[in-house]
């Protein structure tokens, strides 16, 4: 039996389609920001008092021969600090070391965060733990003030990101920590350069800053944050790497409560590919340099206002990660309404957000709402969607009327031309109402899957 000969014209056309979608993988922090992403990179900022940041080139990853891959964030004075970490069972060495030092210190007296990109220091055994401790120890040594005692816990939080299962070139890293310290500064360029140094497959540095006031006074406070992540993003307590700094005077216990709440509504509400990293960490440092009354309990008059500020700020930071999803062409908001509980709503939204079939349909601009319904139906919600009461819509971002796809379990006659127009946009919303009984709503943010995602991750270790 003979095989059919391939259609040369079809093969040629297919190759052109694939080659037009794939970009060459480049070294972390190479500065080549896609034109469409430049609008997300700030050209200026107002940064919290008493913090300085800097970076240095180590060459952790062999392909990175000249771009900074070691980042240092410091405070002139000791900070209250809190963090949320991954729940992946294979937790990276820096996660273990940082969690332990925060616990031993009671979230007090933290001076710095040290971050390397290019190697995750995950699944590296006892040697990896010692390497993470060495990073903390060498960072602590840069400060001239004496620690509480020779046996005091480390004062520097450690983060790593990159390839799993490989040991750090620890001597190279520790030899460059003094260089990063010497490069410290408080200008916008310092902050932007440091945000770039924590990148891996990111196409742009993710940095934000803002000023705000609290009800108790007219004093101006400041907050700044940087984050990294473009792949292996799916929430489980925290996700990716994030560092937030503020000059508000706030004690550890209320700060920890605020971060836990903020992370749940932001970093825990995004998904790029459904993978939860071994290294996920989001930390917040508060040095009180702006002065004012110390927020020492959750009953303080400024507590709720500060929680809202940090939550909104965290949501905006988390959205930047989704906008830089590996190979992504769309930013998608998933809104689930009328669920029996917030947990149910989040599980349904998460199920839709991580569905490869939903994400590839969005990339192909295909209004295949059946895939959305399928993901809704197999979610792990304790109280699932009511099939005969479920409705699905596309909501355009231009303010025009939503396009109903399914109403009370009955398919609508879809205007395919309008659906295609909505799906052409960079931003869109998928709205899923899971019953007709008023209930709980939630938001989740995700992106599409393109050919480029496969290319980047097939080539990640090189």
UniProtKB/Swiss-Prot annotation:
CDD domains: OAT (cd02152)
UniProt-annotated site: Involved in the stabilization of negative charge on the oxyanion by the formation of the oxyanion hole, residues: 161-162
Site note Cleavage, residues: 238-239
Record: residues binding substrate: 200, 228, 239, 326, 457, 462
Family per record: Belongs to the ArgJ family.
Task performed by this protein: Catalyzes two activities which are involved in the cyclic version of arginine biosynthesis: the synthesis of acetylglutamate from glutamate and acetyl-CoA, and of ornithine by transacetylation between acetylornithine and glutamate.
Identification of the protein by name: Arginine biosynthesis bifunctional protein ArgJ, mitochondrial
């Amino acid at each position: 039996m003979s095989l059919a000969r391939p259609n040369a014209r079809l093969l040629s056309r297919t190759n052109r389609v694939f080659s037009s979608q794939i970009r060459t993988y480049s070294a972390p922090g190479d500065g080549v920001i896609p034109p469409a992403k430049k609008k997300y990179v700030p050209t200026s900022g107002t940064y919290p008092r008493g913090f300085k940041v800097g970076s240095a080139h180590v060459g952790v990853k062999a392909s990175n021969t000249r771009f900074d891959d070691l980042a240092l964030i410091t405070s002139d004075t000791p900070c209250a600090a809190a963090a949320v970490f991954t729940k992946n069972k294979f937790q990276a060495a820096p996660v273990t070391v940082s969690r332990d030092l925060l616990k031993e210190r009671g979230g007090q007296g933290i001076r710095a965060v040290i971050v390397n990109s290019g190697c995750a220091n995950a699944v590296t055994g006892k040697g990896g733990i010692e390497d993470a401790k060495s990073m903390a120890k060498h960072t602590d040594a840069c400060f001239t003030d004496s620690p509480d005692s020779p046996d005091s816990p480390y004062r520097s939080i450690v983060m790593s990101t990159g390839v799993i299962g490989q040991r750090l070139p620890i001597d190279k890293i520790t030899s460059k920590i003094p260089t990063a310290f010497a490069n410290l500064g408080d200008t916008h360029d310092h902050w932007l350069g440091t945000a770039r140094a924590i990148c891996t497959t990111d196409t742009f540095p993710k940095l934000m800053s803002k000023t705000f006031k609290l009800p108790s006074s007219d004093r101006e406070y400041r907050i700044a944050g940087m984050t990294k992540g473009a792949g292996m993003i799916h929430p489980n307590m925290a996700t990716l790497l994030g560092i937030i700094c503020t000059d508000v005077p706030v004690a550890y216990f209320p700060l920890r409560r605020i971060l836990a709440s903020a992370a749940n509504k932001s970093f825990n509400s995004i998904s790029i590919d459904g993978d939860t990293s071994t290294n996920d960490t989001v930390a917040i440092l508060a040095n009180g340099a702006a002065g004012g009354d110390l927020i020492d309990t959750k009953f303080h008059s400024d507590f709720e206002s500060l929680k809202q500020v940090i939550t909104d700020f965290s949501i905006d930071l988390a959205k930047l990660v989704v906008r830089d999803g590996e190979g992504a062409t769309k930013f998608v908001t998933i809104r689930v309404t009328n669920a029996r509980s917030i947990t149910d709503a989040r599980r349904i939204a998460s199920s839709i957000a991580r569905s490869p079939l939903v994400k590839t349909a969005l990339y192909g601009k295909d209004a295949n709402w059946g895939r959305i319904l399928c993901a809704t139906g197999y979610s792990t919600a304790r109280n699932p969607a009511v099939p005969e009461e479920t409705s699905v819509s596309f909501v355009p971002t231009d303010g025009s009327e939503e396009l109903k796809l399914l109403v009370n379990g009955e398919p609508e006659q879809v205007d395919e031309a309008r659906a295609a127009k909505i799906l052409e946009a960079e931003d869109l919303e998928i709205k899923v109402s899971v019953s007709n009984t008023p209930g709980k709503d939630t938001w989740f943010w995700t992106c599409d899957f393109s050919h480029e995602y496969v290319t980047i991750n097939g080539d990640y270790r090189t």
